[in-house]
């Protein structure tokens, strides 16, 4: 093992977490080399297709399992004024700015359109099906029976759930208290969603001092918290807490660097993987850390993860602007 610097808070560069690394993972290959800047999310559908969101361009792109481009759902910000007019005249529904998306078992696409203050729903062929008005959506995850879970920039609860008709049916998840300043505390509770095939929902707190993923059932009952509290992460957590205290007395908008940068859940087992920049942590379904890895491209550059797909035999990791890479899944031995 070797000690490697993994993540520094921009505002507190003097303090840096150091993690014990079990192995270095080098990507087998780069996927979709035309995609890099603006990359938001990568998903694998049950149909084997790979879905990629990069905003504002090229938008949400669907690839076959062999890598052939099948479909693109465009965004306003990636088009000229003339192209936007042509789209409007033709009846094409454009996404304003996609922050995240998910795909359900039927291939329908749910896009968190932050600029449009909505979740836009498209069929697998790109036909627009429905708009759900949601103020500043940040992350989405599909649930059984056509439901979709949504996180927002400032809702009173962490998660809102909408049914197949676009009606809000429940909210859940009280924000944890990290600051007495209300807007700052809500910002620090911003999170990313994922779901598994077992009916669980996962909420990754992106700005918590200690990287944390909370498990819920689909009805909002909280299960376990998976928290990275190893000694090597103590310095980073202390730096984040100092920055919280520093910004608490200010009146301007919160400004923090994400601590937990990507969440991946193996759909069949519910095992959680979380990324902190170029460092990848694997936890078993009981929340025990199994291993820690560093991520590299075939050329030796670090892969700073913004999105993560976990499969039985491989990992797909993507970052803005470095692009999307396929890794052989390690055995954790």
Question: Language-model features: where?
Answer:
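Bacterial N-terminal signal peptides
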Residues: 4-12
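Eukaryotic scaffold repeat domains enriched in small/polar residues
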Residues: 19-333
């Amino acid at each position: 093992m070797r000690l490697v610097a993994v993540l520094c808070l921009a505002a507190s560069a003097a303090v840096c977490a150091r993690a014990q690394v079990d192995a270095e993972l080098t990507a087998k290959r780069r996927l979709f080399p035309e995609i890099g800047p603006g990359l938001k999310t990568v998903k694998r559908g049950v149909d084997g297709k790979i879905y990629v969101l990069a905003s504002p361009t090229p938008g949400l792109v669907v690839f076959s399992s062999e890598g052939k481009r099948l479909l693109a759902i465009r965004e306003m910000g990636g088009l000229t004024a003339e192209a936007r007019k042509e789209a409007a005249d033709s009846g094409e529904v454009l996404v304003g700015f996609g922050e995240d998306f998910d795909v359900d078992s039927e291939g329908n696409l749910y896009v968190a359109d932050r600029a449009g203050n909505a979740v836009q729903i498209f069929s697998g062929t790109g036909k627009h099906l429905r708009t759900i008005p949601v103020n500043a959506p940040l992350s989405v995850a599909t649930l059984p029976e056509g439901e979709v879970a949504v996180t927002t920039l400032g809702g009173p609860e962490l998660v809102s759930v909408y049914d197949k008709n676009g009606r809000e049916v429940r909210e859940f998840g009280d924000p944890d208290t990290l600051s007495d300043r209300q807007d700052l505390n809500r910002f620090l509770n911003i999170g990313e969603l994922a779901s598994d095939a077992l009916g669980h929902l996962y909420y990754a707190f992106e700005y918590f001092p200690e990287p944390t993923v909370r498990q819920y059932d689909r009805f909002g009952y909280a299960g376990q918290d998976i928290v990275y509290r190893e000694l090597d992460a103590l310095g980073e957590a202390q730096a984040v807490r100092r920055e919280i205290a520093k910004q608490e007395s200010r009146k301007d908008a919160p400004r923090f660097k994400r601590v937990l940068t990507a969440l991946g859940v193996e759909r069949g087992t519910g095992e959680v993987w979380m990324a902190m920049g170029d460092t990848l942590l694997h936890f078993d379904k009981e929340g025990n850390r199994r291993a820690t890895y560093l991520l590299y491209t075939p050329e030796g550059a670090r892969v700073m993860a913004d999105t993560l797909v976990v499969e039985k035999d491989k990992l797909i990791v993507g970052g803005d602007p470095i692009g999307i890479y396929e890794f052989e899944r390690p055995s954790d031995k």
